[in-house]
Design a protein with these regions (language model features):
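Long, charged, glycine-rich C-terminal linkers/tails
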Residues: 23-29
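Intrinsically disordered, low-complexity regulatory regions enriched in serine/threonine/proline
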Residues: 2-7, 29-217
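Amphipathic alpha-helical segments
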Residues: 1-23
Length: 217
């Protein structure tokens, strides 16, 4: 029986999660909240070879972000030691953009510093021991944002695994700068269209919630 390549495995994972492949870009997309398709999409870009990379950009609630990380973890069993969370800026090598924002009273605030420190203090030692990613994502909410499950966040996240380079890969990544550019600003405007989160996911899928969000744009 022929063994699937890494690219084929990632393709199958994306499809099983309900993503549709965009013919023009080659990215996988999934609408999360009906009616807000311009604001909420995931972008998966699988690569073949030794590096397993899955990237996405999303405007979403923090709780939903963690749920998605857990969902990805379940679908990528066998790659769990290769799923790393980065938060920083564009580096010469590798070329990766990652940033995360949330808002308080409509004022964007970067979380890169907190997330990076969280990785250094907590996550990094566990990766050496092939720690489960699900525990990491749970801890981000429980330890850092216990009362912020309904916080809107704008995120660009990048998962990458390279067996050859291993944990030494952290050294350069953690030197990333926390700079915002024009593309960041344009994206930040989009997640403000999220309807109110009150713990009931079905409520924000309703017509009333969607219409209310459009009026606030």
């Amino acid at each position: 029986m022929k063994k699937n390549s890494i690219k084929e495995s990632i393709d199958a994972m994306c499809k099983s999660l309900g993503f549709k492949k965009d013919r023009r870009s080659g990215h996988y997309m999934r609408e999360v909240t009906p009616g807000l398709e311009d604001a909420i999409h995931f972008f998966f870009k699988p690569y073949s070879g030794k590096a397993v990379s899955v990237s996405f950009v999303v405007g979403i609630y923090l709780k939903e972000l963690v749920d998605l990380i857990d969902e990805l973890y379940e679908k990528t069993d066998g790659y769990k030691s290769l799923l790393w969370l980065w938060c920083g800026d564009l580096l010469p090598d590798p070329k990766v953009v990652q940033w995360m924002y949330y808002t308080e009273n409509g004022d964007p605030e970067q979380l890169c510093g907190e997330i990076r420190q969280f990785i250094v203090d907590y996550a990094e030692p566990f990766f050496v021991r092939n720690h489960d990613w699900k525990d990491i994502s749970d801890s981000i909410v429980k330890r850092k944002y216990a009362d912020a499950e309904g916080t809107p966040v704008a995120v660009a996240m990048y998962y990458r695994g390279e067996q050859d380079r291993g944990i030494d890969y952290w050294t350069e990544i953690l030197k990333g700068r926390d700079n915002r550019n024009e593309k960041d600003e344009l994206f930040l405007k989009k997640y403000r269209s999220l309807p109110p989160y009150d713990g009931d996911i079905q409520r924000r899928y309703s017509v009333e919630a969607i219409e209310g969000a459009r009026k606030r744009k």
